[in-house]
Design a protein with these regions (language model features):
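A short beta-strand-to-loop transition that corresponds to the Sensor-1 phosphate-sensing loop
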Residues: 8, 77-78, 107-108, 112, ...
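Amphipathic alpha-helical segments of the small helical/lid subdomains adjacent to P-loop NTPase cores
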Residues: 133-140, 147-185
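P-loop NTPase nucleotide-binding core
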Residues: 1-72
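Switch/connector loops and helix/strand junctions flanking conserved nucleotide-binding motifs
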Residues: 11-17, 82-84, 133-139
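Short, glycine/acidic-rich hinge or "gate" loops at secondary-structure transitions
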Residues: 39-51, 73-76, 118-129, 178-185
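Short secondary-structure boundary/capping segments
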Residues: 20-22, 88-96, 136-153
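Substrate-engagement module of ASCE P-loop NTPases
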Residues: 59-65, 94-122
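Conserved P-loop NTPase "ATPase switch" module shared by AAA+ and STAND
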Residues: 68-98
Length: 185
């Protein structure tokens, strides 16, 4: 069974309440789709509420575990998209709220961590741009392995050294002081 989330579709908001609402609006349907596509396995399963995406995932995983259903593969595309938008918009306090304590995002990843630990999730594969968000979430989600740091994946995930160097040289020539600061950067 597969549940696929796409955080690139996350609609931004100026406060935590708006972000939570938008996060839940976006992420309730993927788990509901997984249940619908596997209705033969989920039989009489019903969500107790369809308000919180994390609670819905938790309930579906609990049912899967209790009834010996196949393990779930969780795919999250651009897991850091909206948090990166907060950082680039200089909304650091809001970013802090999203990635700390019992925020909607942190709770979501805690549910995934519990699902892996309890055996209802086989694997969670996340794609993203920067490891910043994952670093800030790791105390609650400390079961992640960042594949881009493995040499065998360098050409597959992210930029190669040569690609990054070429782009940096281009930016320095076009917008900076030339190649003088290349080695420093």
């Amino acid at each position: 069974m597969i549940v696929r989330y796409d955080f690139s579709k996350m609609v931004m908001a100026d406060d935590m309440e708006g972000l939570e609402r938008n996060f839940n609006d976006l992420n309730r349907s993927p788990v509901e789709i997984m249940v619908t596509h596997n209705r033969d396995l989920f039989k009489d399963f019903q969500f107790s509420s369809k308000k919180e995406a994390s609670k819905m995932l938790e309930e579906a995983l609990g049912y899967a575990r209790e009834h010996g259903l196949p393990k779930v593969y969780v795919l999250i595309d651009e897991y850091d998209n909206f948090t990166n938008q907060l950082l680039t918009a200089y909304k650091d306090p809001l970013y802090e709220q999203v990635t700390t304590k019992d925020s909607v995002l942190r709770t979501f990843f805690k549910v995934i961590k519990a699902g892996i630990g309890e055996g209802s999730i086989r694997t969670c594969f996340c794609t993203g741009v920067l490891p910043v968000t994952m670093d800030d979430l790791t105390s609650g989600y400390n079961i992640a392995e960042i594949l881009t740091l493995h040499p065998r994946f360098l050409d597959m995930l992210g930029f190669t050294y040569e690609e990054a160097s070429a782009y940096l040289r281009y930016v320095l020539d076009k917008y900076g002081t030339g190649q003088d600061s290349f080695e420093e950067l």
